[in-house]
Amino acid sequence: MTDNNHEHKQPLPSLAIAAIGVVFGDIGTSPLYSLKEAFSPSHGIPLTDQSILGVISLLFWAIVIVVGVKYVLFVMRADNNGEGGVLALMALALRSLDEKSKMAGLLMMLGIFGACMFYGDAVITPAISVISAVEGLEIAAPHLSHLVLPLTIVILILLFWIQRHGTAMVGRLFGPIMVLWFVVLAALGLWHILQSPSVIRALNPCYAYTFMAAHVLQAYVVLGSVVLVLTGAEALYADMGHFGAKPIRMAWYVLVMPSLVLNYFGQGALLMHDPKAIENPFFLLAPDWALLPLVVLSTIATVIASQAVISGAYSLTSQAIQLGYVPRMKILHTSELAIGQIYVPVVNWMLLFIILCIVIAFKSSDNLAAAYGIAVTATMVITTILACVVMVKVWNWNKLLVALIIGVFMTVDLGFFGANLLKVEEGGWLPLGIGALLFFLLMTWYKGRMIVKERTAADGIPLMPFLQGLLAHPPHRVSGTAIYLTGSDSLVPVSLLHNLKHNKVLHERTIFLTFVTRDIPYVNDADRVTVKDIDGGLYLVKAAYGFNETPDVKAVLLEVGRTHDMTFELMDTSFFLARETVVPTQLPGMSVWRERVFAWMHQNAAKPTDFFSIPANRVVELGTKIEI
């Protein structure tokens, strides 16, 4: 069986460097565009010293409160057996509730919507990150500015094309490269802070308050740009399972946060000295001789940031499939050593297509910035709500204390979310639309699967009495092994009924195999497989997997063989599957048009042979019709 190598056995500094290469790519490349967008001409904020100090103060305290306090100190405590992310947090919160209660239903919908918002963010991050880095050419080599869009498209196509080959080899370089990136951020910022040290006054939150009070409406609009410094904050929590909380906290406090703060303050110092630098305050931090190297390093950093988002989309899809919210898809493992490195072709090519359309339509990072942020803030609000449930129901914290903590976080989150709602018309509709469409599809799939399960249970035959009757009056037994994959270990598989009806035989060794997904990321190997010997060569096998794992039929059979002294020859084994055809009807459940959508999704789901890695030439599929 597969070892659960998700445990973190490397030295803390090594894990921290690795985390810097994966976890902090998105938030680490935010200085490329955040401050520039905050002073967008459309906001009408004058480039005075007081305004610059006010905006820098807002950026600083947003980073401290949302990332440094909310995520690093509180949310990262709410791990699901070491795993983070909105679906893992949802599973943890649901564990303490009655699954049939309205509260559980609401939390499930919130968690799924949060996951859908991640996809809305995942199509913006690579687009805005790469294009903002390549836009450095407009400063470093103005005569090449016409190449910004074509270069961005080429880089993105190459990035998605290499996914199928895995990124294990180049992944080892991500950490050191991003460490260099953060050191460069810090050095550029510190250089300008030393030239204009008065910018340090922005550490005082009074400047943020004064700015908000003086400009009110414009300042609230600016909050929609300030949130750009927080994009990627959710990754600290979502990637916790890969590295552990300690390395991520260490990387944040020792290198990432100081570097970001120094760079933002350095950009502020530059603007106070030369307001015209608002054209591109990040690249104008660098001396002329360093511009082209900085463009190259920025492009590499944004590719790494995009890679983290793409890998996150694969992982989230895999989790959602195991939890039953997404149809089966073909999942390929790109590394024999790291079980978490996977590739989902459908997700990969859909992301690339949408991202290229976005780049061609929006054309610049300035235009894309309007679309960025709303998905991030929506996920932040959902994370806060789910964390509140965990604090009260799982940790049993004092409700007054929870109200105080969550009240502060929710005020900040809703403030940012409200400010981003103002950008819906300019581009915020894009991630919202993607998220809403995915939410509809995921809820349709989940509801449809529940209806199919109910119809199957209503028409099903209890398994144990049936098998006892079968053993009492056995049909003709044939040599070999038959394995029936079934979704319920208490009902007779439809494929068995059809086999007995048409072929009138039963194999010498017959195994009923059921896969179940637990609400934890990983299942210990010792608890993976349970086998019940019914007698007469009949066995009930239940294989348990976590939502971060991919079921493996061959591995299960090896475990059964090891514990029950059996051998399995694949060429002497037949796998019997029921191919369900879903037929929309007027029966109670969903509206007919949603049932048709579900039937289409069901028809296009990956075949069980692909998903469970079963040799196609050993499979017997028997059709069955289910009316919903």
UniProtKB/Swiss-Prot annotation:
Family annotation (InterPro entries): K+_transporter, K_trans_C, K_trans_N, Kup
Transmembrane segments: 15-35, 55-75, 104-124, 142-162, 173-193, 210-230, 252-272, 281-301, 342-362, 372-392, 400-420, 426-446
Primary subcellular site in the record, as a coarse category: membrane
A molecular function GO annotation: potassium ion transmembrane transporter activity
Subcellular location field: Cell inner membrane
Coiled-coil ranges from the UniProt annotation: none
Catalytic activity entry: K(+)(in) + H(+)(in) = K(+)(out) + H(+)(out)
Membrane topology: Multi-pass membrane protein
Record function comment: Transport of potassium into the cell. Likely operates as a K(+):H(+) symporter.
PANTHER family assigned to the protein according to its UniProt record, in alphabetical order: LOW AFFINITY POTASSIUM TRANSPORT SYSTEM PROTEIN KUP (PTHR30540:SF79), OSMOTIC STRESS POTASSIUM TRANSPORTER (PTHR30540)
HAMAP family, per the entry: Kup (MF_01522)
Protein name, as recorded: Probable potassium transport system protein Kup
Organism for this UniProt entry: Paraburkholderia xenovorans (strain LB400)
